UniProtKB/Swiss-Prot annotation:
Site entry (Cleavage), positions: G33, A34, L239, G240
Post-translational modification: Ubiquitinated by Nedd4 following partial capsid disassembly; which might play a role in intracellular virus movement during entry.
Domain characteristics, as noted in the entry: N-terminal amphipathic alpha-helix domain is essential for the membrane lytic activity. Late-budding domains (L domains) are short sequence motifs essential for viral particle release. They can occur individually or in close proximity within structural proteins. They interacts with sorting cellular proteins of the multivesicular body (MVB) pathway. Most of these proteins are class E vacuolar protein sorting factors belonging to ESCRT-I, ESCRT-II or ESCRT-III complexes. Minor capsid protein 6 contains one L domain: a PPXY motif which binds to the WW domains of HECT (homologous to E6-AP C-terminus) E3 ubiquitin ligases, like NEDD4.
Residue span of motif Nuclear export signal: 67-76, 231-242
Protein name as annotated: Pre-protein VI
Induction: Expressed in the late phase of the viral replicative cycle.
Pro-peptide region(s): 1-33
Species this protein is from: Human adenovirus C serotype 2
Motif (PPXY motif): 148-151
HAMAP family in the record: ADV_CAP6
Length: 250
């Protein structure tokens, strides 16, 4: 069995395959180095331990002992405590004052709200002469509407409900006899026909060109040219009606 080179099937970084001893894929060795949180945390711890060592050495030295004695003589610790206590008490006093001011503002009566004066109506000098009429002199207008009679009243009186037609009119029983208006005139009178008056007759003399055209007969169609599409279209559609404008004086 022949040896198969599987390196040709592996992914490549340029001309170098990703297999063999080069197995550092995804580490800081690729792409010029990556950011490592572990190295950052270890560096911070080393820096803190270094500062602690230097501080302990300085505190335990002779200079540190002299500094501690001097602070004890000046009662530095008591001053720090007193300063912190005074600061805390000042903050508490300010808070108490703010709360007390809010309580007093709520307990004190509110000042009365000044209402604006009512607006004065200004009367124009033109309207001063007009006075409102007194109630005893007021006139009451009563309008009467003529409504049509009810159905029972119309039947009792025997009045027609529609305008009667002359050939179909019949007698109506009742107290009052109906009178029909707007009837056509009787057909006995014959109207004489009105003859129209004499009117002026205008006689026009035909021109010589029209006489020649009438004598020559109908116009013959133009010969159709074989190679011209306009002449073919004129032979199919025609040239239309030839109009002739003439001015005549009467």
């Amino acid at each position: 069995m022949e040896d198969i080179n599987f390196a040709s099937l592996a992914p490549r970084h340029g001309s170098r395959p990703f297999m063999g001893n080069w197995q550092d894929i995804g580490t800081s060795n690729m792409s010029g180095g990556a950011f490592s949180w572990g190295s950052l945390w270890s560096g911070i711890k080393n820096f803190g331990s270094t500062i602690k060592n230097y501080g302990s050495k300085a505190w335990n030295s002779s200079t540190g002992q002299m500094l501690r004695d001097k602070l004890k003589e000046q009662n530095f610790q008591q001053k720090v405590v007193d300063g912190l206590a005074s600061g805390i008490s000042g903050v508490v006093d300010l808070a108490n004052q703010a709360v007390q001011n809010k309580i007093n503002s709520k307990l004190d009566p509110r000042p009365p709200v000044e209402e604006p004066p009512p607006a004065v109506e200004t009367v124009s000098p033109e309207g001063r002469g007009e006075k409102r009429p007194r109630p005893d002199r007021e006139e009451t207008l009563v309008t009467q509407i003529d409504e049509p009679p009810s159905y029972e009243e119309a039947l009792k009186q025997g009045l027609p409900t529609t305008r009667p037609i002359a050939p179909m009119a019949t007698g109506v029983l009742g107290q009052h006899t109906p009178v029909t208006l707007d009837l056509p005139p009787p057909a006995d009178t014959q109207q004489k026909p009105v003859l129209p008056g004499p009117s002026a007759v205008v006689v026009t003399r035909p021109s010589r060109a029209s006489l020649r055209r009438a004598a020559s007969g109908p116009r013959s169609m133009r010969p159709v040219a074989s190679g011209n599409w306009q002449s073919t279209l004129n032979s199919i559609v025609g040239l239309g009606v030839q109009s002739l404008k003439r001015r005549r004086c009467f």
